[in-house]
Design a protein with these regions (language model features):
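Compositionally biased terminal segments of proteins
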Residues: 1-154
């Protein structure tokens, strides 16, 4: 069951709409919002949608701009970032093998928790400047040992 109180109703509805789009069928929700919906440990305001498949950046950008009024802030090399109705949206190709099959819960496609842990640890290792990544890992440490989380990452 999703912890829907962790995101605004409009954000959840936008997520459902985006995941119904044919051009976004390979994209899954990742990051803090995916964890918040699963675990209920914090509020989250953005939508990170990742795919492992190459996508037509121009076609996806055009669809999001025309159908949703996306204000694009960055579009290059399999990465699209912007805002729809003030909600930050990232559509990114993240090419690494799945640890587990993505889940679909209440119409939402989410990466598995082990996959998200690997992404969070990668973000900390490469940047380490976002407090929310540490909050997420701290919460996850109540469910997974640190060694287990490191195994997901390596």
């Amino acid at each position: 069951m999703l912890q829907k109180e962790t995101i605004e109703p409009g954000t959840l509805e936008l997520l459902k709409q985006l995941q119904r789009e044919p051009l976004l069928q390979s994209f899954n929700l990742v990051g803090g919002t995916a964890l918040a919906l699963r675990m209920g440990h914090r509020k989250s305001i953005d939508l990170d949608l990742f795919t492992r498949e190459a996508f037509d950046l121009e076609e996806v950008t055009e669809m999001l701009v025309h159908h949703y009024g996306m204000k694009v802030t960055y579009a290059r090399k399999q990465t699209l970032k912007g805002f729809i109705n003030g909600i930050k949206i990232d559509c990114i190709r993240y090419d690494y093998p799945h640890l587990n099959t993505p889940d679909t819960i209440e119409e939402i496609r989410l990466e598995s928790v082990p996959d998200i842990i690997a992404m969070k640890l990668s973000a900390i290792a490469h940047n380490g400047s976002r407090i929310k990544d540490y909050i997420d890992i701290a919460n996850l440490s109540t469910h997974y040992s640190f060694n287990t989380m490191l195994e997901f990452y390596t």
